[in-house]
Each structure stands twice: as C-alpha cells, then as structure tokens.
Amino acid sequence: MKDWLDQIKWDADGLVPAIAQDHKTGRVLMMAWMNREALSLTAAENRAIYWSRSRGKLWRKGEESGHVQKLHEMRLDCDADVIILMVEQIGDIACHTGRHSCFYRVYEDGEWKTVEPVLKDPHAIYSAGH
C-alpha cells in the first residue's frame, strides 16, 4: 500500500495548501501551508501544525496565542492537492488580527468591506506570553 503522504500532490516547494474549517459550522477559518512533516505531525498529535513560509519553520497553531486548532478530521480533495482540516478552534479566534476567521472581508460595491469584529486585540493576544 502506498504511503498516505505519497498520495498528495505537493507543489515544487514540497507544500500543500491546507484550509482549516470549523468542524461544527463548516465555516472556513483560515488557509495555511503544510509540508510532509507538518501534515504527519498534525495526524499524530491531532492538532493543526503548519509550515510557516515567512519563518521557514513548523508552526503549531496556537503556540503563541493559545488558539489551538484541535483536529477532528482531515480530507484530501479530488486532485489530491488541497487538504481540509476540520477543527475545533480553541478560544474562538483563528486569525492573527483577533477575529474568528481570516476571511473577514467581503467584496461589495467595488471594494473590500470588513464585516467581522475584532474579538480580541492582537497586541493583547501576542503579548500575553502563551
């Protein structure tokens, strides 16, 4: 049997996009990147672990903010090039801006409008020493 990680179509940088979705509501929370190690650890630890392209290292979601994503289910799309993580978002905040979702802007009347409130000031989140 082929290794489950080998069935994924990784991009040229060895990454695959991962969409985090609320396991109860189905709402999209965020999108991030995963490499083989991040995906393997996500499955092993039952929590979302991503690859930070800007920092060049593994990023355990919630390691600084406390806003961990507990894994309930992983799905692979029909082309095997996108992962969906069905998660429980601890603390109800997925976005580094302090909002529930990173998708808090809607296109309306020719512009992007903010439609979701900040639930917690990002400075308070990231200076709390989690």
Swiss-Prot record:
Pfam families, alphabetically?
Answer: PRA-CH (PF01502)
Q: Where do the annotations place Mg(2+) binding?
A: D77, D79, D81
**Cofactor-binding details, from the entry:** Binds 1 Mg(2+) ion per subunit.
Per the record, what are the reactions this protein catalyses? 1-(5-phospho-beta-D-ribosyl)-5'-AMP + H2O = 1-(5-phospho-beta-D-ribosyl)-5-[(5-phospho-beta-D-ribosylamino)methylideneamino]imidazole-4-carboxamide
EC number in record: 3.5.4.19
The keyword 4Fe-4S appears for this protein: no
Task: State the needed cofactors, names only.
Answer: Mg(2+); Zn(2+)
Signal sequence segment: none
Alphabetical GO CC annotations of the entry are: cytoplasm
- The residues that hold Zn(2+) are C78, C95, C102
* Keyword entries, A-Z: Amino-acid biosynthesis, Cytoplasm, Histidine biosynthesis, Hydrolase, Magnesium, Metal-binding, Zinc
The alphabetized list of GO BP terms reads: L-histidine biosynthetic process
Q: Which GO terms describe its molecular function?
A: magnesium ion binding; phosphoribosyl-AMP cyclohydrolase activity; zinc ion binding
**Pathway(s) annotated for this protein in UniProt:** Amino-acid biosynthesis; L-histidine biosynthesis; L-histidine from 5-phospho-alpha-D-ribose 1-diphosphate: step 3/9
Q: Where in the cell is it found?
A: Cytoplasm
Complex formation: Homodimer.
Q: What does this protein do?
A: Catalyzes the hydrolysis of the adenine ring of phosphoribosyl-AMP.
- What does the similarity note say? Belongs to the PRA-CH family.
Q: What is this protein called?
A: Phosphoribosyl-AMP cyclohydrolase 1
